[in-house]
Amino acid sequence: MQNIDLISEEEAQKLLEELADKIAAYNHAYYIEDNPLVSDSEYDQLFNTNLKLEQKFPHLILENSPSKKVGAKIANKFAKVTHQVPMLSLSNAFDEQDVRDFVDRIKIFLRLNEFAPIFCEPKIDGLSFSAVYKHGVLTTGATRGDGYVGEDITANIKTIKNFPHKIDNVPEFLEVRGEIYIEKQDFLNLNKEQDEQGKDKFANPRNAAAGSLRQLDSSITAKRPLKYFVYSGGVTEQNLASSQDQLLTKLKECGFNINEISKLASSEEEIFAFYEYLKTNRENLPYEIDGVVYKLNDFVLQNRMGFIARSPRFATAHKFPAIIGQTKLLSITVQVGRTGTLTPVAELEPIEIGGVTVSRATLHNFQEIARKDLRIKDYVFLQRAGDVIPKIMGVDFDKRPNDTETFDTPLFCLSCNSKLHYTPEDIIIRCDNGLNCPAQNYERIRHFVSKNAMDIEGLGRKQVEFLIDKGLISNPLDIFFLKEKNDSSLAKLENMDGWGKKSVENLFKNIEKSKNVSLPRFIYALGIRHIGEQNAKLLAREFGSYNNFIAQMELLRTNEPDIYQKLNNLEGIGDKILVDIIDFFDVKENIELIKKLGGILNIEDYKETREQSSLTDKIVVFTGSLSTISRAEAKATAEKLGAKVAVGVSSNTDLVVAGVGAGSKLKKAKELNIKIIDEEEWLTLIKNV
């Protein structure tokens, strides 16, 4: 990663665009697929790089910035549940200084002279949930989803042992929030069962819990050893108590499981002592934790602090350092992705780290092998922080055997044997043989049918590989003629190994169902390099319909300057991504394939809905000193209500809030005849919005 202090504005823009796409993909894999692609520590590093870039270049903040989002958009297989109060994620603290900064921000924001008590509790590594009770009866259970809309898992949550279905002496409407998890030993037992039944094993306890809870068949969920803790009252918590410690006491009285390991800290020293206690004893706990959560204990102060786009100001998560292990590097294999990128993967002697058996680790690129001087048969240090594929941190050179073997970077593609192309600025090696490369073609079809693309259930890795090997499909278009081909063939698919009448019927139904697709999903399904879900949405928003999209892309092939400029001006589409789009549509076969797909699919026009309020999109300027609230709190409230807060007055300004000692900005607002109100009027206004 580049040095943020030395980065230019142009480089920052490109990096922000890349980070937005990467983090969106990682969010989807983690929250929706229950299949994280990178370690927690690597994700945190990317996210913090994004934040630092935005702090240095605030004018470059993208519409699809990760700092504005929580989780990922929910899948289509569950009914949707809208959270009355968003289920946001927490900001992270990685060391004691970060925690001190968190405490200082509270003091400054609230204008406090003394330490405000902080409630400390373990950060459970599970799946967040919300449960709603009406007249004491459980009516709705939901996942976090994207923070605003989650998945309805009511039937599944009712199968969890000791989860209350009915409670007494509570308000007419009650919400609780918490974490659903699987204990370490239960996870090992579950994986043993999966292995004995020939099913894929779960990567870690969190994945197992998430996968179990997101089953369409609740009888499967009922067989899984799920447990839970509640830690919040959601929209109703302030009807139950005035502080976090009182709330947990009340929820326990109602019959909910709460985590008894907690601490109400009265100083920074007490915070750090509790953190060290948990860090030292985490391996002795029956469940996985990945840090400690700190919250302002007082709900009145929490309300005043409020939220930023994706997290509350009044809470943070102090993360534990990653778990380190050591094992032997047995070999290095190479994978070819759908865009031709070659990725080396370390094959390891299996090792258990934090209750999970690890046998593979990502090496990211071939330069990393040389930089770390990795050799086959070396003993390597492995880092795991709740991830699926951990990261190799380095070599134990003191234990290096005499018979180690260096790894030779391939010159030819392992799939199609074509000469490889090396791109120094991307630090990657690529096969440019496109769809003539079997590995790329396979991965492209796999991407096309994936959940967040065309979402064709029943076409997993094994099924796609089988259909290609049998010559039944060779490109995405063939999928939609599979039933027709099967009906006219003597060798029926349902009679072949691994298939059956029911599975084939379901597959054909799912293929037919997928023909109705939104424009953003369709664009994403095409597999254009660097066009993830967010950038696909940007393109869909710009062009509106499939017909306009394909027409404009054909113009792009003819070097039409207007369309080039239009794409170049899109926030989130930089020069690098634009080149990738041009390269994709320069291939005649790609245009032909898209047109044929457009002829058989119902591709819905792009639609976007936005909630409106009286302050939405209004430009507000604060000037002078405010007596009852801090400037930061006033700004946060305005943004929460949809306003855009500016630092200077211009003809575009809609409202000026003038405090004591307002000067030049107030004068200019009067000259421009802009509406001006004082602090008291502002407080009345926001109360009534």
Swiss-Prot record:
<feature type="binding site">
    <location>
        <position position="413"/>
    </location>
    <ligand>
        <name>Zn(2+)</name>
    </ligand>
</feature>
<dbReference type="InterPro" id="IPR041663">
    <property type="entry name" value="DisA/LigA_HHH"/>
</dbReference>
<keyword id="KW-0235">DNA replication</keyword>
<feature type="binding site">
    <location>
        <position position="144"/>
    </location>
    <ligand>
        <name>NAD(+)</name>
    </ligand>
</feature>
<feature type="binding site">
    <location>
        <position position="437"/>
    </location>
    <ligand>
        <name>Zn(2+)</name>
    </ligand>
</feature>
<dbReference type="Pfam" id="PF01653">
    <property type="entry name" value="DNA_ligase_aden"/>
</dbReference>
<keyword id="KW-0234">DNA repair</keyword>
<dbReference type="GO" id="GO:0005829">
    <property type="term" value="C:cytosol"/>
</dbReference>
<feature type="binding site">
    <location>
        <position position="416"/>
    </location>
    <ligand>
        <name>Zn(2+)</name>
    </ligand>
</feature>
<dbReference type="Pfam" id="PF03120">
    <property type="entry name" value="DNA_ligase_OB"/>
</dbReference>
<keyword id="KW-0464">Manganese</keyword>
<keyword id="KW-0227">DNA damage</keyword>
<dbReference type="InterPro" id="IPR001357">
    <property type="entry name" value="BRCT_dom"/>
</dbReference>
<dbReference type="GO" id="GO:0006281">
    <property type="term" value="P:DNA repair"/>
</dbReference>
<feature type="binding site">
    <location>
        <begin position="89"/>
        <end position="90"/>
    </location>
    <ligand>
        <name>NAD(+)</name>
    </ligand>
</feature>
<protein>
    <recommendedName>
        <fullName>DNA ligase</fullName>
        <ecNumber>6.5.1.2</ecNumber>
    </recommendedName>
</protein>
<feature type="active site" description="N6-AMP-lysine intermediate">
    <location>
        <position position="123"/>
    </location>
</feature>
<dbReference type="InterPro" id="IPR001679">
    <property type="entry name" value="DNA_ligase"/>
</dbReference>
<keyword id="KW-0862">Zinc</keyword>
<keyword id="KW-0479">Metal-binding</keyword>
<dbReference type="GO" id="GO:0046872">
    <property type="term" value="F:metal ion binding"/>
</dbReference>
<comment type="similarity">
    <text>Belongs to the NAD-dependent DNA ligase family. LigA subfamily.</text>
</comment>
<dbReference type="InterPro" id="IPR013840">
    <property type="entry name" value="DNAligase_N"/>
</dbReference>
<feature type="binding site">
    <location>
        <position position="319"/>
    </location>
    <ligand>
        <name>NAD(+)</name>
    </ligand>
</feature>
<comment type="function">
    <text>DNA ligase that catalyzes the formation of phosphodiester linkages between 5'-phosphoryl and 3'-hydroxyl groups in double-stranded DNA using NAD as a coenzyme and as the energy source for the reaction. It is essential for DNA replication and repair of damaged DNA.</text>
</comment>
<keyword id="KW-0436">Ligase</keyword>
<keyword id="KW-0460">Magnesium</keyword>
<dbReference type="InterPro" id="IPR036420">
    <property type="entry name" value="BRCT_dom_sf"/>
</dbReference>
<feature type="binding site">
    <location>
        <position position="179"/>
    </location>
    <ligand>
        <name>NAD(+)</name>
    </ligand>
</feature>
<keyword id="KW-0520">NAD</keyword>
<feature type="binding site">
    <location>
        <position position="295"/>
    </location>
    <ligand>
        <name>NAD(+)</name>
    </ligand>
</feature>
<feature type="domain" description="BRCT">
    <location>
        <begin position="610"/>
        <end position="689"/>
    </location>
</feature>
<dbReference type="InterPro" id="IPR010994">
    <property type="entry name" value="RuvA_2-like"/>
</dbReference>
<feature type="binding site">
    <location>
        <begin position="40"/>
        <end position="44"/>
    </location>
    <ligand>
        <name>NAD(+)</name>
    </ligand>
</feature>
<dbReference type="Pfam" id="PF12826">
    <property type="entry name" value="HHH_2"/>
</dbReference>
<dbReference type="InterPro" id="IPR013839">
    <property type="entry name" value="DNAligase_adenylation"/>
</dbReference>
<dbReference type="GO" id="GO:0003911">
    <property type="term" value="F:DNA ligase (NAD+) activity"/>
</dbReference>
<dbReference type="InterPro" id="IPR033136">
    <property type="entry name" value="DNA_ligase_CS"/>
</dbReference>
<dbReference type="InterPro" id="IPR018239">
    <property type="entry name" value="DNA_ligase_AS"/>
</dbReference>
<dbReference type="InterPro" id="IPR012340">
    <property type="entry name" value="NA-bd_OB-fold"/>
</dbReference>
<dbReference type="GO" id="GO:0006260">
    <property type="term" value="P:DNA replication"/>
</dbReference>
<dbReference type="InterPro" id="IPR004150">
    <property type="entry name" value="NAD_DNA_ligase_OB"/>
</dbReference>
